């Protein structure tokens, strides 16, 4: 298929005052796509089609936990020139090999689980909350729900008790699918809820946990996944297939600001999104591929891509962020090197970690080998950009060793969830395989825009073209100075089509603000029309701040560039109308920082690189060095002068979803971080570096 086939076109006579043209994929210029094929209009249809088409082929694999090892290790650090011994609890895991089940088996299991739910009183008139880690059991139970037209409700593992109760109460969930280790977080909501009657555990909970549930909610029955499966086989029920307009899922957003909202996704929305993604990527991802499944299934990105994989006939390999690498397992390989995926999906934070890991290994090499790597990287990028031969030879000599860390056979990576720095995309696409940026939201069923593998280097720093099941336009934002009649056109991205959701549950004001009467969803993202009618994202409307001199600063754009630094584990930018430039709050990468300080000791930093992280973060010399590093990156990436930070605040603890500094999809919670460091931010503005 020719590259030009993926271009999108302006819809004739569609331009209105204050708006751009309406753009569509060339594949859907006449009519938007709403299915991958005739006869598939629901998730249950998808399951049946997958079993029919792929039969006894491997569908998904999982690893059994053999042993969990906990040990206390001593770490020696120097504090004020004295050695201090710190104790830290380390957990490692011993896992078995991947064990696989076929597409026919997935179908059989799903029908049995659906039967078991009906036998337990869970029907299409109720809902089932999924509050668990990503696993084959999660996915097959959800498929079981679809076989009986039972709507599911998704909640992140990191959701607090208030959020769990809200989702239970709003959706009137009668059943919960969960993991034993998450049961304690359910006790509070169970005490409040009158709806829940059944808890399905992915594995057998301890007697203590069972007693806790019984004492908290005596009317709630606990059953294991295996026992539910057996019950369904003993009491089989005929499938009760859903209709296209039935609710498939209430998917709760991760809530980077405010209260999580339940996005109402109909079966036809999910199938339309799958149809659009399939039209673009099925030329490249197929029955021969192995896809690593480790992102939260409560996130639309993972949810939709697993549905796509089911349809394509690829193999899903379930994994955990805790056991991805060889470093966190014993007597076995990590999930990446054991499963050896050919396709990897991830959020920018994952790809930044991979890049930093590669660079850390390179920096430990002798100087001549570092030069070989750097020269080979530059040469390969040159060859790719000009479509010249020679890349395979460079892979064989230099880059295959890098690829081995991800299993050695990756063909494509797909990035979503937030903006990926163009430099990171180019680096990994040269070292490992093409990294394809995409863009979508929960409200649009994820992949609304994507680049095809042969296009990544042609349309750098864009999110690609619209899939054939949506159309989009830009709308003026006068308050921020973005206009669609500028060159290039800029404005808020609005999306419409069969993949767009049915609104938010019980949020009339939010629905009124986000959706128009003629079906447009206002994404809140600011974009511009780039080369070939691709879409380039600028930032979220809420993250664009007017500075002292009246110019606007896009905070996420700044963060995406600084995230690439080996000194940075995470970053949050702040700007306001009282200052001309931003301040950046940095959670340092501890190993990267200590290595950097060792190499640069004696400049503005005269302390001990092995001091505690807390002391290093308070050190003005360290602050100066990190600020200098960020300023240099900003200049290299051609940030505007108003986007170059004027100060830095260093955070001495890891930002996680558990401590409420990140969402479950690893986006920074800006309001929380800024509130926590408000005093330090003002001090950073007052310093003269």
Curated annotation (Swiss-Prot):
It catalyses: a long-chain fatty acid + ATP + CoA = a long-chain fatty acyl-CoA + AMP + diphosphate. Its EC number is 6.2.1.3. Keywords: ATP-binding, Fatty acid metabolism, Golgi apparatus, Ligase, Lipid metabolism, Membrane, Nucleotide-binding, Vacuole. One of its GO terms (molecular function) is long-chain fatty acid-CoA ligase activity. InterPro entries: AMP-binding_CS (IPR020845), AMP-dep_synth/lig_dom (IPR000873), ANL_N_sf (IPR042099). GO terms for cellular component: endoplasmic reticulum; fungal-type vacuole membrane; Golgi apparatus; lipid droplet; plasma membrane. Its cofactor is Mg(2+). GO terms for biological process: long-chain fatty acid metabolic process; long-chain fatty-acyl-CoA metabolic process. Its main location: Golgi. It is a peripheral membrane protein. It comes from the Eukaryota. Esterification, concomitant with transport, of endogenous long-chain fatty acids into metabolically active CoA thioesters for subsequent degradation or incorporation into phospholipids. Plays an important role in the determination of viability in the stationary phase. The FACS motif is required for catalytic activity and substrate specificity. Belongs to the ATP-dependent AMP-binding enzyme family. This is Long-chain-fatty-acid--CoA ligase 2. The lineage of its organism: Eukaryota, Fungi, Dikarya, Ascomycota, Taphrinomycotina. The gene is lcf2.
């Amino acid at each position: 298929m020719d590259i030009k086939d993926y271009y999108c076109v302006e819809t004739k006579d569609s331009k209105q005052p204050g708006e751009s043209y309406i753009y569509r994929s060339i594949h859907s210029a006449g009519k938007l796509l709403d299915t991958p094929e005739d006869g598939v209009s629901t998730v249950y249809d998808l399951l049946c089609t997958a079993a029919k088409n792929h039969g006894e082929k491997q569908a998904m694999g999982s690893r059994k936990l053999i042993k969990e090892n906990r040990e206390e290790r001593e770490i020696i650090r120097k504090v004020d020139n004295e050695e201090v011994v710190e104790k830290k609890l380390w957990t490692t895991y011993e896992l078995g090999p991947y064990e696989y089940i076929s597409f026919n088996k997935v179908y059989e299991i799903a029908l049995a689980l659906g039967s078991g739910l009906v036998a337990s009183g869970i029907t299409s008139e109720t809902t089932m909350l999924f509050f668990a880690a990503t696993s084959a059991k999660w996915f097959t139970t959800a498929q079981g729900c679809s076989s009986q037209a039972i709507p599911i409700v998704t909640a992140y593992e990191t959701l607090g008790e208030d959020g769990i109760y809200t989702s239970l109460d709003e959706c009137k969930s009668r059943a919960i699918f969960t993991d034993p280790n998450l049961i304690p977080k359910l006790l509070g909501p169970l005490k409040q809820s009158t709806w829940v009657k059944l808890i399905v555990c992915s594995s057998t909970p301890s007697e203590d946990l069972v007693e806790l549930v019984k004492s908290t909610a005596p009317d709630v029955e606990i059953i294991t996944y295996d026992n539910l499966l057996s019950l369904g086989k003993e009491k089989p029920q005929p499938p009760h297939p859903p209709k296209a307009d039935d609710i498939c899922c209430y998917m709760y957003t991760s809530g980077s600001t405010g209260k999580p909202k339940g996005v109402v996704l109909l079966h036809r929305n999910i199938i339309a999104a799958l149809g659009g993604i399939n039209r673009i990527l099925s030329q490249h991802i197929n029955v021969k591929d192995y896809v690593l499944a480790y992102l939260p299934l409560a996130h639309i990105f993972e949810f939709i891509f697993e549905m796509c994989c089911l349809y394509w006939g690829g193999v899903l390999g379930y994994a955990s962020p805790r056991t991805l690498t060889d470093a966190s397992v014993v007597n076995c390989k990590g999930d990446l090197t054991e499963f050896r995926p050919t396709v990897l999906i991830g959020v920018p934070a994952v790809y930044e970690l991979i890049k930093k890991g590669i660079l850390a290994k390179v920096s430990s090499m002798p100087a001549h080998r570092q030069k070989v790597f750097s020269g080979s990287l530059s040469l390969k990028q040159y060859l790719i950009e000009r479509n010249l031969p020679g890349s395979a030879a460079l892979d064989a000599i230099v880059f295959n060793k890098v690829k081995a860390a991800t299993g050695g056979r990756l063909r494509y990576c797909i990035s979503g969830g937030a903006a990926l720095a163009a430099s990171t995309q180019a680096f990994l696409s040269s070292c490992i395989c093409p990294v394809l940026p995409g863009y979508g939201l929960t409200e649009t069923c994820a992949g609304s825009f994507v680049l095809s593998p042969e296009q990544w280097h042609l349309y750098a720093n864009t999110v690609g073209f619209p899939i054939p099941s949506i159309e989009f336009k830009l709308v003026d934002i006068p308050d921020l100075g973005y206009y669609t009649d500028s060159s290039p056109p800029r404005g808020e991205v609005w999306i419409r089509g069969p993949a767009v959701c049915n609104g938010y549950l019980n949020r009339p004001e939010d629905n009124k603000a986000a959706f128009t009467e003629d079906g447009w969803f206002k994404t809140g993202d600011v974009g511009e029309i780039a080369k070939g009618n691709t879409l380039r994202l600028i930032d979220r409307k809420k993250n664009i701040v007017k500075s002292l001199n009246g110019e606007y600063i896009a905070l996420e754009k700044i963060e995406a560039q600084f995230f690439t630094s080996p000194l940075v584990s995470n970053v949050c930018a702040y700007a306001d109308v009282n200052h001309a430039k931003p301040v950046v709050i940095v959670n340092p990468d501890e190993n990267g920082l200590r290595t950097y300080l060792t190499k640069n000791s004696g400049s503005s930093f005269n302390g001990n690189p092995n001091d505690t992280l807390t002391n290093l973060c308070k050190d003005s010399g360290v602050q100066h060095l990190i600020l200098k590093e960020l300023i240099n990156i900003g200049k290299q990436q051609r940030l505007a002068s108003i986007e170059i930070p004027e100060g830095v605040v260093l955070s001495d603890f890891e930002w996680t979803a558990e401590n409420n500094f990140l969402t479950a999809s690893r986006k920074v919670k800006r309001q929380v971080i800024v509130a926590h460091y408000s005093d330090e931010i003002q001090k950073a503005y007052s310093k003269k570096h």
